[in-house]
Swiss-Prot record:
It comes from the Bacteria. GO terms for biological process: division septum assembly; FtsZ-dependent cytokinesis. This is Cell division protein ZapC. The keyword Lyase does not apply. It holds the Pfam family ZapC_C. Disulfide bonds: none annotated. Keywords: Cell cycle, Cell division, Cytoplasm, Septation. Its main location: cytoplasm. InterPro entries: ZapC (IPR009809), ZapC_C (IPR048372), ZapC_N (IPR048373).
């Protein structure tokens, strides 16, 4: 069961593009606004005008918080931040082609699913990413680490998303104790 959360979806929640900040935001009632990192060039056209935070969005948000509670040990505030950004990415980002060429191939086969955390390796750097959308061959992942330089001119910043083929997702290192029978 979900522990007490800071923010549960309400009927008056709305997506809107903030011209002031140049990013998609979620109006969380009369006095609160949450800013996503997503700029106009990465958003679907509907996201550039006021848009209802629908029942489908609310269900995804709540389910995502539950998944985060199982996969990450983080504060409720961070769960809400990841879930709002994840919901925005899942529903309101333009479809992307995979950009796998930036990342090292994994030697292990992984099973990608919503809310699962993996590592991406790029130019000797290792970053943690969170799956926000998955298909048979590729996943849209959100960067959990602060920044990941992709090349000399481009970096992925925290909470930004990139689509990668599953063969680029590296499992997290898990240490397991083996008990003798």
């Amino acid at each position: 069961m979900v522990e007490i959360m800071l923010l549960m979806p309400k009927k008056d929640w709305q997506w809107r593009y903030s011209d002031t900040y140049g990013v998609l935001s979620v109006s969380l009632g009369s006095e609160m606004e949450f800013l996503t990192p997503y700029k106009s060039k990465s958003l679907i056209p509907d996201a550039l005008s006021e848009l209802e935070f629908s029942v489908e969005h609310a269900k995804f948000y709540i389910d995502f918080i539950e998944l985060l509670s199982k996969s990450l040990t983080i504060s409720d505030a961070m769960k809400v931040q990841l879930a709002l950004n994840g919901t925005a990415a899942h529903f309101l980002l333009k479809p992307q082609m995979p950009k796998s060429w930036f990342f090292d191939t994994s030697s292990m086969c992984v099973y990608s699913e919503l809310g699962k955390v993996f590592q991406l390796k790029c130019r000797g750097a290792i970053a943690q990413v969170l799956v926000v959308e998955t298909s048979i061959q590729a996943s849209l992942v959100m960067l959990l680490s602060n920044e990941l330089p992709l090349n000399d001119n481009k970096s992925l910043m925290q909470f930004e998303c990139i689509k990668v083929m599953h063969d680029r997702l590296h499992p997290l290192k898990v240490s397991r104790a083996i008990a003798a029978a």
